[in-house]
């Protein structure tokens, strides 16, 4: 996804910079772990392929400390943060960001504005709707994205240890190009692995994370089984409708032949309504549900001890709105050369890719504005 803009070599360099930054602000950088398989093991064939590229694990335990250290550094360098402030609109034509305080005591006050020379619009998942509002308002040309939907699979780690020894964050995949469908395992967590609930648009979906602190060790493995489905007319609306239909009693679903939902790292039950059969899920997902179940059945062949010792949390989803067309040199909008879309605004999947996109944009902006400087080391320092 990043390499289409800047090529494979540059994409890897940018992602290395992201990891370097995480290590820089990590309280224990030596605990950042890399999984980098070099060859596909024979025992997964012919059922699956294994994606061969490095994956880094920072550790959920440390994210708040990393964020605090990073924040303190940015403040020390003069970066201003506007807390408890909502951006209500952006005028791309007049270079104006319009915002309003969400503090109750300021509720009746007028909007405030910030004017910009260059704007990096880098929202997360909660900002997808706002990004789409802007895209619609300014009639930004775009290209449709695929549907990304599936389940969060969980089982005792012992069943997958043979593959974990090859690749901690293994990514099994298979493709059905004639059907426009591909599947992959996604975001594997081991050792102290927990399923997490995400709430978006009022609906529950699932993800996973792993603790580094071995006090949390539960010897479980969880990962997403995600389908990438092409050819659906409105992928974003389709995904939201399917996720909404897969809710019951205000939460998502859980199915297992033998197990019950696990607990969170805090010792609470993972919010999910347990169902005793999958007929309702199949009715909602239609023919696509067969791909998920075939994936699980073939895992039982590759990992023979697995059998019925597993459970799935339904659904896992990655909402991808249409991707605005941007200039490849700096991810600026084709209609507004000083507005750069990054992260979920550009349908990025994952924090590493989002961070790499931001660095890519920052490098270009700094190189342009400092192109006439007499101090090339200044550019070198701040671009790095």
Regions found by a protein language model. Give the residues of each.
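Residues forming the flavin
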Residues: 1, 29-384
